[in-house]
Amino acid sequence: MKRIGVAPVKPPNPKYVPKPYEQMLYPGQRIQIDVKFVPSACLTGEAKGKRFYQYTAIDEFSRWRYVEAFEEHSTYSSMIFLLHLVQAFPMPIECVQTDNGTEFTKRFTKASLDEDLTLFERKLKELGIKHKKIRPFTPRHNGKVERSHRKDNERFYATHCFFSFEDCRIQLKRYNYRDYN
C-alpha cells in the first residue's frame, strides 16, 4: 500500500539535537554530586559481603574533585558529605546539582506529597545553597561526575582490594589526592 501511495508514509523520527551547554564562569557556581557503589569484587576479609559507597563532588568550572567513602547510602550520609565538602572547598558554593536519588530528595516518593525536606535538602537550605535536580533517567546531565566514576573503576577499583571500611576510606583518600587534583 505504501508503494502505490495509498497509505500515508510516516515521517522519520527527528534527530536528537542537544541543547548548548551552559558554561560555568567561576569556581563554586555549580558542583555535581553523585554516589557510586564500591564494587563487591574489591572487598575481601572482614569487608566481604558488606556494601560501601563513594560520594563524589566535582566543581564544573575548575574540575576540583572531592571524594569520601561511607558505609551507608542515606540522606544522613549525604548531609555529612555536604558539610565536609563545604569545609574542603576553597570557595563559597552557590549551587549543587544531583540526580533524583532518595539520598538527596524525596521528589518521587509518596512522602514528597507533604512538603517535608530530606536532611540533605534542609542542610542546603540552611547553608543558602541552591539545589538543582537533573531530569530523571538522564545521567548525562551529571556527566562530569559520571565520567569520574568510570575512571575510578578503570584506575582504582580494578587494581585495589579493601579489608575493611577504614582501609577503603584511607586508600580512596590517597588515590584522590595523588591521581586527580
Spans of model-derived segments:
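Basic, flexible linker segments flanking DNA-binding modules
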Residues: 1-41, 102, 109, 115-121
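An active-site-proximal beta-strand-loop segment
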Residues: 33-65
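Active-site beta-loop-alpha junctions of metal-dependent nucleic acid enzymes
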Residues: 50-51, 67-95
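Acidic/histidine-rich, metal-coordinating catalytic segments
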Residues: 89-112, 135-137, 142
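Charged alpha-helix within mobile-element recombinases
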Residues: 113, 119-181
